[in-house]
Amino acid sequence: MADINKIAEELGTLTILEAADLVKLLEEKWGVSAAAPVAAAGAAAAPAEAEEEKTEFNVVLTEAGANKIAVIKAVREVKAGLGLVDAKKLVEGTPAVILEAVSKDEANAAKAKLEEAGAKVDVK
């Protein structure tokens, strides 16, 4: 254990250039690369970037709120061609997907309109 502590103390006195030279020497001697962990960390960050690049969103009505009539009207405005009965079924059957695979702008506009009517909405 004393040898390890002595090595750690000596490594602490190295300059950055000396430490870089030591890394190169150890890579050559042991046939390893210090760059491998960096590549693994970069690969782990890739899914987060892919998630940010999402282009299609679903608008989900989670709760109709107190004023169901206003929410039903808002659902009919947001989802073109939807009849009164179908809109009522969607509102009463929460959680319900109102719009699927729409752009972020369209999803946010629909969310704003539905929330203005008193509904609780998630964009996924």
Swiss-Prot record:
UniProt-recorded name of the protein: Large ribosomal subunit protein bL12
SUPFAM superfamilies on file: ClpS-like (SSF54736), Ribosomal protein L7/12, oligomerisation (N-terminal) domain (SSF48300)
GO molecular function, one term: mRNA binding
Gene3D superfamilies the UniProt entry points to: 3.30.1390.10, Single helix bin (1.20.5.710)
Transmembrane segments: none
Assigned keywords, A-Z: Ribonucleoprotein, Ribosomal protein
Organism from which the protein derives: Akkermansia muciniphila (strain ATCC BAA-835 / DSM 22959 / JCM 33894 / BCRC 81048 / CCUG 64013 / CIP 107961 / Muc)
Assembly: Homodimer. Part of the ribosomal stalk of the 50S ribosomal subunit. Forms a multimeric L10(L12)X complex, where L10 forms an elongated spine to which 2 to 4 L12 dimers bind in a sequential fashion. Binds GTP-bound translation factors.
Record-linked InterPro entries: Ribosomal_bL12, Ribosomal_bL12_C, Ribosomal_bL12_C/ClpS-like, Ribosomal_bL12_oligo, Ribosomal_bL12_oligo_N_sf
Family: Belongs to the bacterial ribosomal protein bL12 family.
GO cellular component: cytoplasm; ribonucleoprotein complex; ribosome
Biological process according to GO: translation
Function: Forms part of the ribosomal stalk which helps the ribosome interact with GTP-bound translation factors. Is thus essential for accurate translation.
The UniProt record lists the keyword Ribonucleoprotein: yes
